[in-house]
């Protein structure tokens, strides 16, 4: 037994590593327990089912992909942030092959409330960060946002465009950057 691998964070880290090496098919309660060096029961102490484990793993992958950049410059203006987000998506697709198209987007359509809730929580975090960038961007025109065209609505639009790019596996942000320039600068 490996007592250091029994934390929820370590179990999720191990699940991410299994996905990187073997894809989604490689993740099971048994395979994660084996890789952690713990009993199956230990995994069940944290996750009641494989679906719950996968849901939490999906959320942790989103967090891993969009971990806060150490380069604060990417959060000083909207254009830098959008470039960074698209780069993170591309890097995430390379680190977690098939994550976006085959599994993560499927959680939105899943019948499990927990899976949907975890995905929405991860997405809400990304949206909130984008709103903060928009609110702090000193380059934005004073009249850019109105009652009908709010920071939040624009952030949701940018996020929707990002998800669309994700499905298409098109990580060139140039069109979105031009939309940002024309809409708010």
Question: Where does each model-flagged region fall?
Answer:
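N-terminal intrinsically disordered/low-complexity leader segments
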Residues: 1-6, 143-145
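Short amphipathic alpha-helix in the helical subdomain of ABC transporter nucleotide-binding domains
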Residues: 4, 147-155, 172-176
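Helix-turn-helix
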Residues: 10, 14, 18-52, 56
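Short hydrophobic clusters on alpha-helical segments that form packing/core surfaces
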Residues: 11-19, 61, 89, 162
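Hydrophobic alpha-helical connector segments
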Residues: 56, 70-95, 151-155, 177
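Short, basic, alpha-helical segments at the C-terminal edge of helix-turn-helix-like DNA-binding modules
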Residues: 59-66
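Helix-loop "lid/cap" segments that line or gate small-molecule binding pockets
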Residues: 86-94, 102-110, 133-134, 178-184
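Amphipathic alpha-helical packing segments from all-alpha helical-bundle domains
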Residues: 94-95, 102, 112-140, 149-152, ...
């Amino acid at each position: 037994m490996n007592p250091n691998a029994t934390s929820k964070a370590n179990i999720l880290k191990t699940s991410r590593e299994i996905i990187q090496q073997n894809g989604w098919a490689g993740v099971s309660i048994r395979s994660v327990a084996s890789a952690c060096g713990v009993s199956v029961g230990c995994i069940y102490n944290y996750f009641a089912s494989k679906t719950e484990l996968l849901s939490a793993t999906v959320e942790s992958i989103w967090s891993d992909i969009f971990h806060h950049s150490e380069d604060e410059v990417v959060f000083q203006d909207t254009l830098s942030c959008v470039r960074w987000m698209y780069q993170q998506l591309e890097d995430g697709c390379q680190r977690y092959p098939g994550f976006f198209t085959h599994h993560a987007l499927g959680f939105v359509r899943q019948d499990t409330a927990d899976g949907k809730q975890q995905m929405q929580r991860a997405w809400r975090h990304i949206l909130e960060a984008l709103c903060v960038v928009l609110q702090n961007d000193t380059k934005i025109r004073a009249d850019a946002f109105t009652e009908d065209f709010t920071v939040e609505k624009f952030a949701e639009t940018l996020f929707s465009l990002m998800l669309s790019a994700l499905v298409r596996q098109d990580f060139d942000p140039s069109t979105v950057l031009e939309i940002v320039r024309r809409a708010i600068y």
